[in-house]
Amino acid sequence: MPYVPLEWLRQYVQVRPGTDAAALAADLVKVGLEEEQIVPARVTGPLVVGKVLTQEPKEQSNGKVINYCRVDVGEQHNDAPGTGKEPSELPSRGIICGAHNFKPGDSVVVSLPGAVLPGDFKIAARKTYGHISDGMICSAAELGFPDDGKHGIIVLDERYPEGEVPAPGTDALALLGLDDEVVEINVTPDRGYCFSMRGVAREYSHSTGGAYQDPADTTNADFYPQGLQAPGNDGPRVEVNDEAPINGVPGCDRYVARLVEGVNPNAPTPDWMSRRLQASGMRSISLAVDVTNYVMLELGQPLHAFDADKLTLPLVVRRAQAGEKLTTLDDVERVLDPQDLVIADGEGGSRVLAIAGVMGGATSEVSETTTNVLIEAAHFHPVSVARSARRHKLPTESSKRFERGVDYQLAPVAAQRAADLLVRYGGGSYGPITEIDRTQAPAPIEFALDAASRLTGVDYPREQVVGLLREIGCQVNDDGGATVQVSAPSWRPDLTGSAELVEEIARLDGYDNIPVQLPVAPAGTGLTFAQRARRDIVRTVAEQGLTQVLSYPFVGDIYDRLELPADDERRQAVRIANPLADDAPLLRTSVLDSLIDVAVRNVSRGIGDVALYEVGNVTTSAGVVPAPIPGVAQRPSQAEIEALAAGTPRQRLHLGAILCGQHGYSGVLQHVRNWDWADAVELVRDIASLLGLKLHVANAERAPWHPGRCAEIRIVVPTKNPTRPQIGEVIGYAGELHPRIVKKLGLPERACAVELDLDALIECSSKQPVVKAQPVSTYPAAKEDFAFVVDEATPSQEVAAAIIIAGGKLLDDVRLFDVYRGPQLGPGRKSLAFSVRLRASDHTLSASETEAARARIIKQVGKYTGAKLRA
């Protein structure tokens, strides 16, 4: 992300006094430029100007000659005469130096003990070559500057006119620009213009109101001493021929080629430019390359420098041909794609020189012998550059800017700026210019003046709206109507509609000015009945000692392992078009499909006592006919929407549970038993009781349960005749899993499972009449015991139901307390013993009433179940 040196920023915008890096970051945040980090100064500690007083060459045993110097570092840093680590008659410090490009009387840069130089090089007084060096005389490289070719220390007398050299003790950090902190900012994709000092300075001006000076203003003689020179007919030949534009948009609509001749290849990059490049995260390479990088950082226009003597004109901008190759500046040979936009030379563009907007090639790069430089400044289409950069995995500073959008009017200005710098610092001369301009200004935006107020809730006066739009560079044609015509500035390709203009108005006025008002929820009744019921169910199951889990609803071919019949509707699972895992491409039709795998995983890891439950959706496609998917060209009709809804697989909320191993924990005072089928059924009864429902439980055969220990769960639906309730549809199963399946899965013996349709349970519960509390009878109860002999296949529930019907209002309670099988009953017969309690609400039952009720019970049970009273 871009680095913003405060010293550089001051050149283009008036910065408030006392502003440091933290304050700069805070000001930029106000206009939407977030702070990534604050980069501290490269050098810390005392770095001062020193004047060499004496220089004593001392030859060492290894033949090396070093200099022992006494250096005046200012009154506040000097050792007084006769004091210090090595006393001297001169107020100074003793310093050892191995360089020889200075003499007594020269002013140099001295780092004193306590300073930290780049590379975490800490300066301290140390004994070396027989003397104590109480500091260090610094070279450019030691301070992090590029090599100036002299390989020696910095002599300030060579940089300042006579009489203007700073006095000893002067702070050299500020003198050399080493104390400047840098702010790294985060730029969103729509704000590509902020990848330049020009853009950041403009945003800082918006934030603080500081006076802004556009570095792209060619009428400013300080930046452009020659103004903007016009192209002529004698410029380099250029052809732009994009025969395969992406999405119909040409890859290049503006191309400027500009020659600068006679550049001194040994001319150094000026210190101020090197410092700014380094502060911005770039290394100094050569004057020509540094100038192109500097102008890119300053204006936001990527440039490329070709060695003009290595080119064969014309330059051709075209699409690459299949199989073409290019060795880029990073020494990687790249195979080009026909969608790559390239710069080539020669007739017909026979030789590829660069990938447009991404990186140049090695064959035409600027070298240490280059004297004639051709500067390329172009406007490339963002999509074309972005695809090439991603295709070749080659993100560059250039591509980052082009793919976010570059000012389409900036190419000739940036080329002029680069030429001026090369002429000034490289001793070159202005050469001819060629420009191809096919750019088109975007159409004006019709903008409603009240749009910003409507969307933000802030009352923006007409004058403020127009003023803010003009402040960001828009041309506003205001004829006094409700709307205005707005033309976005060339550096803002992101301003394409009314919404973007509203965002700019809110941003410049300040997001803090938008009132923060949380919406107030309308008064209601809180949770719905279904929501409360689901919460109560989850709590009730957890209170029974079960642990809730959440598993993925995606399963594989588990149905054979669970031994489901071939025609079982649970096999009609929905197949996912793009599954997360190839071995789980189906949506579960039962919670047990995925919950069993969770239990198996726990058991395989040594957890033998498992009591898990899950509440989740199951999906079934049984009876669903998929509808054709309508196109996107127009809104689907109501009939198509209804067909899609009808063709969508149904989802129901189910509860599943797995119970195996010990029920609870064993201890000295506690005997622990294993979970069994009765626990599974009782869990279902607890849920039904919570919802105020009565259940009809009957034996059933359903995989994967044990055929003799599987309970089919139905809801008893009340009718107008309370003694004749209706038995509803099946809403679940509970019981022991089939021993063969348990063994196959590796679960403990007699593992149990539950599966309930919670949606059906909750729906039935919501329809139940409100239960009215009945007063507790204070009259005594009459107790009667019955032992009925029935067929082995007759469930006890049917006998109990007949007792309830016969007992009517007098029935207070009925319980099964014994089941007996014996030879005296005969084969296929069993005895069910019930304890019945009878009670009237308003009187004590007489013997005759009790006897009559007993007779009715015996008759009713015999009628509906064929039972005989056991003798």
Question: Across the structure, where does each feature detected by a protein language model lie?
Answer:
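A carboxyl-terminal module marker
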Residues: 3, 23, 470-477, 629, ...
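Class II aminoacyl-tRNA synthetase-like tRNA-binding/catalytic domains
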Residues: 126, 316-366, 526-651, 717-718, ...
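Conserved mixed alpha/beta core segments that line enzyme active sites in large multi-domain catalysts
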Residues: 49-94, 274-275, 279, 292-366
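Glycine/proline-enriched, intrinsically flexible loops and inter-domain linkers
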Residues: 3-8, 12, 24-26, 55, ...
